[in-house]
Amino acid sequence: MEGKDVGLIGLGVMGQNLALNFQNHGYSVAVYNRTEAKTKEFAGKHPEIAATYTLPDFVNTLSQPRRVFLMVTAGSAVDATISGLTNLLSRGDVVMDGGNSYFPDTERRSSELAKLGIHFLGVGVSGGEEGALKGPCIMVGGPKEGYDHVGEMLDRIAAQVDGACCQYLGPRGAGHYVKMIHNGIEYAIIQVIAEAYDLLTRAGRLSTRHVRSVFKEWNERELNSFLMEIAIQVLEKTDPETKRPLVSLILDRAKQKGTGKWTSQNAMDLGIPTPTIDAAVASRNLSALKDQRVKAAHITKARRKTASHSLPGNFTERLEGAVRASIVVSYAQGFHLMSAASENYQYGIPFTEVARIWKGGCIIRAKVLDSISRAFQANANLENFLLDPEFAATLTRLDKKWRDTVKCAKLAGVPIPAIDASLDYYDGYRSERLPANFIQALRDLFGAHGYERIDKPGQFHSDWLS
């Protein structure tokens, strides 16, 4: 029997859909799952795909060099699966990890398998269940030789916008690193949109239907994006039992899988400010403290000015500008961190290509990526695209609307940590002088840490108490 083109391990919904995507594009596919029941269920629905029930049978079903795609839960499950494969694979075979693995884990696995002559690729896959089936965004890192064995098939199953939304992004953990940044930006944008929803419903007292109409208008202009599209879908859904908007019945306790936290932690490690992403992570942490928040609301007798007249008549226009500016800043922080990481980890990430492939298939696809792509085409070494003239002009135009929104939120007592952090970041980034001189003076006084001067070179220390 002729060997299968690709093998997929892990038959969760994402794994099943990727297997079908490969099959729909003309590739012969073999699958394996840790539990036989899941494999049998899938095989019953899709007999054209080869079902296997042991790892040796799975590996022997594949043509050489073998191409194995893992879609298992990130962490120990990936290591366990790799451990079961290593004695069965041969030099030159390719193993692709399509889960949300932490990039240092990918670096380690890549190094370990390289010693065995096996190419290990960290493959970031974005697009959710539908993207996995119809065309995701695919971010690949690892040995280039390994990518050369699978690049064509990955291009074919990827979303297609200005070419395949699949790109080789660099060695070792580069692919999973870029996927981590993608997820950090995703956290930030979701939080910004949620804050807009909160302001409109709590301070503006708009109905869910009215907010949906506002978002629809925004999505027809510069805020056009996948996340805005699904925000509209969420607001359209009615609970069949109560006939109320389903979103209003959902407990306000947001969960997270950790990729946003990884982004913030890495930003701290590299010394790159990402306050909007940080605020989004912290906001989910705060939401988890539901019982404490209820107690605090009662003990402090929290009162908010939620009357509709507390917001100006053209507030939705101002808020649109603030949301747009905050989303631009969210992307800017992510790309800035990516730039620092690319240099620090010697990835050589092609930022123009990252912006391009994010335009299709992925969760953060948005109209603004066209402008981001143009910025990097004009200057491939741009540290932060807020330095690009087009973005500088855009944020200047949105400045007043941004500030008016923050002011209205403060007066209404509605927290907008991500929008607020975005504006603070923008003001800080464009400040020629910050109060760090005062901080350095304090550090020198209590800890003799020294300081630099603006009028002459060198490191200085003063006796502040004499």
Enumerate the predicted regions with their spans.
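NAD(P)+-binding Rossmann beta1-loop-alpha1 motif at the extreme N-terminus of oxidoreductases
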Residues: 1-67, 92, 129-132, 453
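Conserved dinucleotide-binding and phosphotransfer motif residues
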Residues: 25, 45, 116, 270, ...
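Hydrophobic beta-strand scaffold residues
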Residues: 29, 51, 120-121, 274, ...
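Glycine/threonine-rich flexible loop motifs
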Residues: 67-84, 99
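Rossmann-fold dinucleotide-binding core
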Residues: 79-83, 96, 102-213, 220-245, ...
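Interdomain hinge/lid region at the active-site interface
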Residues: 173-176, 201, 206, 213, ...
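Small-residue-rich helix-loop
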Residues: 343-375
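C-terminal amphipathic alpha-helical interaction region
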Residues: 396, 404-466
